[in-house]
Amino acid sequence: GTLPCGESCVWIPCISSVVGCSCKSKVCYKD
């Protein structure tokens, strides 16, 4: 995934994972 979700995941998981985003390099990306 290369589309940023506008969320970081340094301290907490991606809340945006509910819409298909996942944590990569401390930033949430959508696949």
From Swiss-Prot:
It comes from Viola odorata (Sweet violet). The presence of a 'disulfide through disulfide knot' structurally defines this protein as a knottin. Belongs to the cyclotide family. Bracelet subfamily. InterPro entries: Cyclotide, Cyclotide_bracelet_CS, Cyclotide_sf. PROSITE patterns: CYCLOTIDE (PS51052), CYCLOTIDE_BRACELET (PS60008). Expressed in petioles and runners but not in leaves, petals and roots (at protein level). This is a cyclic peptide. Disulfide bonds join C5-C21, C9-C23, C14-C28. One of its GO terms (biological process) is defense response. Transmembrane segments: none annotated. There is a cross-link at G1-D31 (Cyclopeptide (Gly-Asp)). This is Cycloviolacin-O19. It comes from the Eukaryota. Keywords: Disulfide bond, Knottin, Plant defense. Probably participates in a plant defense mechanism.
